[in-house]
């Protein structure tokens, strides 16, 4: 400011010099004619100058206008002076210019000073606001810390209380122990006194250490001390001990990650992001400046925490100081698409750098030709290349977990001079790949990849050298790393399937197995990314919703139903209409079914152990089940109907003892009994059993096959029944009475019939042959134990009519004869037959068949079904006749599939297992699972029926069966990447989506469906039989761009050929 204040004084000085010019120029003026006039003018000029030049202190600060005005006033009144100035203007104008320049410069300086002051003021205000932001953020951090401190205080109080309870409990235990010890010491003291008196009286002592003299006094002291302790702890008796389940708060106690650490606002957050585990990647979008390490000794492990946030200096991010974010509860999210798999961790960076080093050292373009090939013979110029099969597989125990690639054997060089260099290169590659895999195994487990040198001696050595390829085989049934398992066809590789379903990729001749592995891994990654993107593009909006749904996300399902109320209402209306029409439609078959049921009872009395579906002679009461979530078709019965047998002549004499007033006239018999027989799943099973029994020959009775029910005319059945009535009338009367009477008569007969049945069952089961043709050596051994358990259970239940302990265990356990299987590379083998893997049908028969025979034998002596509690009534699913036939056919075809670990988690296996479980539940089995779970499993089978009916009616697939429905639903399950349990927990949602697809078949055809312009494969057409129907259906359901899905990439189950290990 001093410069600005002194500047005007200079201007004043300049202004004072301005009139001095005319004073000096008076002598140089030209002479005039009038000398007086000149003198007067000189005097006037002098007076004017004296008036125009005041003192320095009196001159005010003025701008340019004042100067101009003063100059004008000084020269305008004197024309002669102006003329003199025009004559000599140079000195005055130059002085004026200098003054003007100085004023202009000083004005500019003043403007610059004002602007700089304004900018500094603005910056100060901005800093103030930033400081306020920092203070606000620190305030929130301190509030969170205070909240943690309060929680710590609460937890500390609870722990102190629990510690007090434990001390009280301990004092009580010490008191009780001291009382017992006191009584024992008194007894010992009395005995010791008597023995010491005896010893002192005797002069001879026996062997052993002599007793101390102060033993009695020491024991007395101990007793007195214990008594004093008991008196002190008597008043501290506390509540009974309860376990403490409270843990101290961690760094993630209800505190958002954005508030957990202090971040300076001026720091760039993008450069400070830390990676999180994949299970909690959606919550890991936080930025950290500095994370001081604090270790809490909790559960014996050290974990990083966040106690101090004062440091601002960034800490280098290393794997040692990464924040250990706690994984959320529940199932971790699946890897949906490649776009969502973003990793920022340092181990991924190291792995990519190592992979880049491998690519730089082994360029893939130099290993592979630009064109696609199938078989490339090795040229004489490359004698080093030998076949290097790389086969990925896993052990049966699933315990193989490595951290580097292992070289099984070196490549044979056949005398090549470059062998030493080649081996050196292999060692370098193996070291680099080992480092890569060490980093990869920090985040996921990987299976071993063994590189072997194999010489295919198909002829002589010359032939072997001319047909040398590098073959990489990936096992289709092994649960290995998905990146390696998803190698598909691209421009550099030739892919094919061998007999075992393994994926074989042929490479051109390379110099080392490490090069082949690197090339295959690169191809796997690129192809997998492309296929994942392609799969995600082909999913519609609803399929993407199902893929991205969490397992128990019911809010999304409810919102979908709320937004599609019209669709839900139309679907339920159609289901109700079908339920009503199905009863009327099936009434014409009811009398026929009733006749068959009566005759089947006669046959089952003669042959109590047939191979079809078993009858259930227990009385049932009819009611319809209703479960929540709209998951049932509605026609599944909760309780089975009472059995009613009516003779052809209309005689109802033996049915007078039946309850609920079912003795009706012959005119009303057809309608009422028809509904009862339709609601009775037991009689449908009896129909199946009788049809199987008549078609069997004596030589086929020992094989376990499931022949579908053949349609027979009602007239033929009545004619056969009339012909057989004369010979079997007495037995018909005995079988038509109520189960309660029959149980009473059997009880009066004693143990004879039961013993005969036991012998018959043992003889039959001893020759049972499973589906795969293997005779079980253990099944007949376990049959006698089953029969003995049944007899003991029956003996315990005959006295009071209630279920005893043996019956409870019998109805709860499914496997009376456990099966010991060996798992090897995803296949299951019996211990007595370790060469041939077991089939699914054989496994299920081993699991359920013995229980079925046991339930058949024990059902006669069980109590009435109506007397059971509601919890015990686990109702069987009702099969309509056509559904029953198609289900048995599907079971017959699918039972030939080899059992694998992946097949157990499929809908096909669910169908086969549900068929067995439903049969046993109809016989009175109580499953270990809850009733709600069983209802949902029944609803899933009802979903198959729903899709089958919709496909027949709206998709115009007239030969569509349950087998087609299950295969297509399995394809749909793979397409949306969901589990079987997810299916029967989202029945209504799936029904709505499938119902809408069937309403718009022409516009909404999906990739997982059967082709709409082709004929469905069925038995009897184009040479299709039961042996090749399953594979034919699988061939129609393969995706164009994938094998059978993204996450479930595997060979179709029908094409799996187990390896021959013999």
Curated annotation (Swiss-Prot):
Q: Which residues carry this modification: Phosphoserine?
A: 378-379, 628, 681, 712, 738
**For this UniProt entry, what's an example GO CC term?**
histone deacetylase complex
Any idea which residues bear Phosphothreonine here? Answer: 697, 817
Q: Superkingdom of the source?
A: Eukaryota
Coiled-coil segments, which residues? none
Q: Return the annotated region ranges for Disordered.
A: 1-27, 188-217, 267-337, 370-398, 595-634, 681-804
For molecular function, the Gene Ontology terms on record are:
DNA replication origin binding; DNA-binding transcription repressor activity, RNA polymerase II-specific; RNA polymerase II cis-regulatory region sequence-specific DNA binding; sequence-specific DNA binding
Question: Could you tell me where the Basic and acidic residues compositional bias lies?
Answer: 685-699
Residues bearing N-acetylserine are: 2
Which GO terms are recorded in the biological process aspect for this UniProt protein? Answer: mitotic cell cycle; negative regulation of meiosis I; negative regulation of transcription by competitive promoter binding; negative regulation of transcription by RNA polymerase II; positive regulation of DNA-templated DNA replication initiation; regulation of DNA-templated DNA replication initiation; regulation of sporulation; regulation of transcription by RNA polymerase II
Q: Predominant location of this chain?
A: nucleus
What is the documented function of this protein? DNA-binding protein that specifically binds the regulatory region of middle sporulation genes (MSE). Required for the repression of middle sporulation genes during vegetative growth. Represses expression via the recruitment of histone deacetylase HST1.
Subunit structure, as described in the record: Interacts with RFM1. This interaction is required to recruit HST1.
Extra facts? Present with 149 molecules/cell in log phase SD medium.
**What protein does this entry describe?**
Suppressor of mar1-1 protein
Question: Source gene?
Answer: SUM1
């Amino acid at each position: 400011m001093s410069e600005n204040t002194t500047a005007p004084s200079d201007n004043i000085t300049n202004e004072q010099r301005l009139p001095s010019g005319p004073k000096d120029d008076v002598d140089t003026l030209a002479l005039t004619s009038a000398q007086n006039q000149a003198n007067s003018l000189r005097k006037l000029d002098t007076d004017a100058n004296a008036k125009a030049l005041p003192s320095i202190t009196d001159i005010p600060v003025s701008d340019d206008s004042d100067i101009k005005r003063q100059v004008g006033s000084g020269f305008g009144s004197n024309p002669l002076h102006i003329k003199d100035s025009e004559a000599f203007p140079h000195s005055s104008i130059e002085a004026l210019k200098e003054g003007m320049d100085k004023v202009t410069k000083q004005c500019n300086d003043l403007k610059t000073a004002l602007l700089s002051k304004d900018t500094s003021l603005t910056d100060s205000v901005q800093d103030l606001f930033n400081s306020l932001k920092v203070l606000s953020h620190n305030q929130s951090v301190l509030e969170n810390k205070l909240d943690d401190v309060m929680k710590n205080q609460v937890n500390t109080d609870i722990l102190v209380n629990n510690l007090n309870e434990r001390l009280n409990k301990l004092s009580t235990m010490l008191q009780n122990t001291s009382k017992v010890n006191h009584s024992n010491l008194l007894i010992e003291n009395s005995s010791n006194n008597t023995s010491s008196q005896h010893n002192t009286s005797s002069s001879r002592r026996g062997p052993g250490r002599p007793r101390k003299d102060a033993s009695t006094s020491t024991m007395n002291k101990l007793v007195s001390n214990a008594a004093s302790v008991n008196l002190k702890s008597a008043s501290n008796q506390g509540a009974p001990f309860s376990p403490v389940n409270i843990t101290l708060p961690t760094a993630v106690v209800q505190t958002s990650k954005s508030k957990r650490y202090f971040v300076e606002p001026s720091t760039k957050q993008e450069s400070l992001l830390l990676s999180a585990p994949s299970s909690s990647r959606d919550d890991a979008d936080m930025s950290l400046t500095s994370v001081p390490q604090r270790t809490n000794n909790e559960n014996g492990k050290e974990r990083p925490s966040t106690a101090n946030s004062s440091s601002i200096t960034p800490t280098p991010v290393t794997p040692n100081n990464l924040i250990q974010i706690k994984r959320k509860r529940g199932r971790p999210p699946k890897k949906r698409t490649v776009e969502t798999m973003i990793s920022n961790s340092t181990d991924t960076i190291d792995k990519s750098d190592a992979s880049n080093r491998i690519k730089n050292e082994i360029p893939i373009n130099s290993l592979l030709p630009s064109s696609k090939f199938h078989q490339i013979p090795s040229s004489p110029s490359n004698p080093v290349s030998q076949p290097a099969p790389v086969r990925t597989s896993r052990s049966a125990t699933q315990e193989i977990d490595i951290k580097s690639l292992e070289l099984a054997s070196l490549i044979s060089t056949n005398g090549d001079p470059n062998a030493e260099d080649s081996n050196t290169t292999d060692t370098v590659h193996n070291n680099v790949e080992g480092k890569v895999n060490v980093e990869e195994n920090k985040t996921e487990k990987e299976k071993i990849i063994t590189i072997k040198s194999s010489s295919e001696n198909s002829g002589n050595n010359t032939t072997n050298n001319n047909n040398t390829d590098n073959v990489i085989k990936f096992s289709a049934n092994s649960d290995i790393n998905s990146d390696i398992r998803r190698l598909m066809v691209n421009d550099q590789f030739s892919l094919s399937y061998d007999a075992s379903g393994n994926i074989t990729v042929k490479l051109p001749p390379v110099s080392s197995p490490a090069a082949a592995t690197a090339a295959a891994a690169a191809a796997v990654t690129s192809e997998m990314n492309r296929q994942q993107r392609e799969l995600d593009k082909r999913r519609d909006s609803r399929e993407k919703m199902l893929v991205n749904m969490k397992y128990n996300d019911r809010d999304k399902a409810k919102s979908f139903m709320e937004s599609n109320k019209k669709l839900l209402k139309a679907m339920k209306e159609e289901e109700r209409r079908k339920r009503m029409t199905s009863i009327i439609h099936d009434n014409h078959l009811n009398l026929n079914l009733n006749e068959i049921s009566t005759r089947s009872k006669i046959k089952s009395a003669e042959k109590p152990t047939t191979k079809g579906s078993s009858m259930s002679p227990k009385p049932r009461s009819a009611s319809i089940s209703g479960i929540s979530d709209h998951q049932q078709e509605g026609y599944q019965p909760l309780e089975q109907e009472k059995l009613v047998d009516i003779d052809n002549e209309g005689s109802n004499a033996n049915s007078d003892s039946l309850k609920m007033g079912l003795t009706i006239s012959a005119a009303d018999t057809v309608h009422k009994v028809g509904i009862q027989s339709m609601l009775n799943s037991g009689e449908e099973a009896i129909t199946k059993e009788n049809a199987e029994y008549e078609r069997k020959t004596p030589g086929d009775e020992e094989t376990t096959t499931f022949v579908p029910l053949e349609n027979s005319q009602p007239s033929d059945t009545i004619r056969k029944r009339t012909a057989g009535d004369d010979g079997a009338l007495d037995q018909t009367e005995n079988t038509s009475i109520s189960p309660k009477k029959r149980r009473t008569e059997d009880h009066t007969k004693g143990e004879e019939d039961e013993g005969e049945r036991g012998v018959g069952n043992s003889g039959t089961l001893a020759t049972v042959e499973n589906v795969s043709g293997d005779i079980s050596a253990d099944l007949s051994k376990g049959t006698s134990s089953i029969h003995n358990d049944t007899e003991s259970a029956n003996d315990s239940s005959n006295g009071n009519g209630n279920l005893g302990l043996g019956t409870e265990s019998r109805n709860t356990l499914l496997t009376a004869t456990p099966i010991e299987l060996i798992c090897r590379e995803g296949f299951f083998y019996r211990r007595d037959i370790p060469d041939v893997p077991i089939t699914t049908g054989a496994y299920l028969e081993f699991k359920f068949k013995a229980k079925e025979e046991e339930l058949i034998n024990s059902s006669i002596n069980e109590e009435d079904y109506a007397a059971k509690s509601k919890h015990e009534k686990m109702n069987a699913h009702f099969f309509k006749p056509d559904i029953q036939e198609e289900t048995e056919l599907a079971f017959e075809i699918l039972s030939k599939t080899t059992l694998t670990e992946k097949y157990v988690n499929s809908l096909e296996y669910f169908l086969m297992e549900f068929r067995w479980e439903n049969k046993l539940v109809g016989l009175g089995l109580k499953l270990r699972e809850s009733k709600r779970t069983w209802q949902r499993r029944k609803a899933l089978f009802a979903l198959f029926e729903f899709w089958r009916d919709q496909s027949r009616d709206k998709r115009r697939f007239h030969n569509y069966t349950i087998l087609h429905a299950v295969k297509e639903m399995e394809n749909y399950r793979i397409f949306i990447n969901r589990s079987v349990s997810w299916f029967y927990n989202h029945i209504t949602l799936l029904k709505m989506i499938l119902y809408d697809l069937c309403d718009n078949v022409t516009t909404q055809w999906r990739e997982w469906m059967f082709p709409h312009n082709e004929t469905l494969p069925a038995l009897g057409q184009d040479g299709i039989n039961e042996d090749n129907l399953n594979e034919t259906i699988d061939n129609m359901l393969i995706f164009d761009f994938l094998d059978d899905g993204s996450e479930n990439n595997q060979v179709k189950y029908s094409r799996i050929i187990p390896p021959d290990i013999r």
